[in-house]
């Protein structure tokens, strides 16, 4: 098994606490509302929403995939960090066992620095193709921009 790690960093002019509430704490409600073509619904299968929780995310009609399951490892509201693994679903190819994600939102003078790390755990000696990672980053970036736009259009929410 190989592990391929990819890091990404980008900025937002939305304050970290507000962004964390929308992007992490209420994503299961907000994303289906603002991007139903991407995510139809999210449901908790086990747990209370904290560490150890298993969620099923059902994708919308605009997606190439049907569903994924996430296992939450940590949510730190004080330090604005979140980690989980994609453990099941058709977004995992035959060559990927799981994908670990870590997100950290860092307060900056004019908003937030968002730092993400993705670790692809492959089966056997399979290598991850750069275009697979790039496509995932583009989808995540598009979804993030939708959330950011929603927060700008609704400044009184998530305070």
UniProtKB/Swiss-Prot annotation:
Top-level taxon: Eukaryota
The UniProt record lists the keyword tRNA-binding: no
InterPro entries, sorted: Bet_v_I/MLP (IPR000916), Bet_v_I_allergen (IPR024949), Plant_def-hormone_signal (IPR050279), START-like_dom_sf (IPR023393)
Any matching Pfam family: Bet_v_1
UniProt keyword Secreted, yes or no: no
Gene Ontology cellular-component terms listed: cytoplasm; nucleus
Subunit annotation: Monomer.
The protein's name in its UniProt record: Major strawberry allergen Fra a 1-C
Recorded name of the encoding gene: FRAA1C
């Amino acid at each position: 098994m190989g592990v391929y790690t990819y890091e990404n960093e980008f900025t937002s002019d939305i304050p970290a606490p507000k962004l964390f509430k929308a992007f992490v704490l209420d994503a299961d409600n907000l994303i289906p509302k603002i991007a139903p073509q991407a995510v139809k619904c999210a449901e908790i299968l086990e747990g209370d929403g904290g560490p150890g929780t298993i969620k099923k995310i059902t994708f919308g009609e605009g997606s190439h995939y049907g569903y994924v399951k996430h296992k939450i490892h940590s949510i730190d509201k004080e330090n604005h960090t979140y980690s989980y693994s994609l453990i099941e679903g058709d977004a995992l190819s035959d060559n990927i066992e799981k994908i670990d994600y870590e997100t950290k939102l860092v307060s900056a003078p004019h908003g937030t620095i968002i730092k993400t790390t993705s670790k692809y755990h492959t089966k056997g000696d399979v290598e991850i193709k750069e275009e697979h990672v790039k496509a995932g980053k583009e989808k995540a970036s598009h979804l993030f921009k939708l959330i950011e736009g929603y927060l700008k259009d609704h400044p009184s929410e998530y305070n």
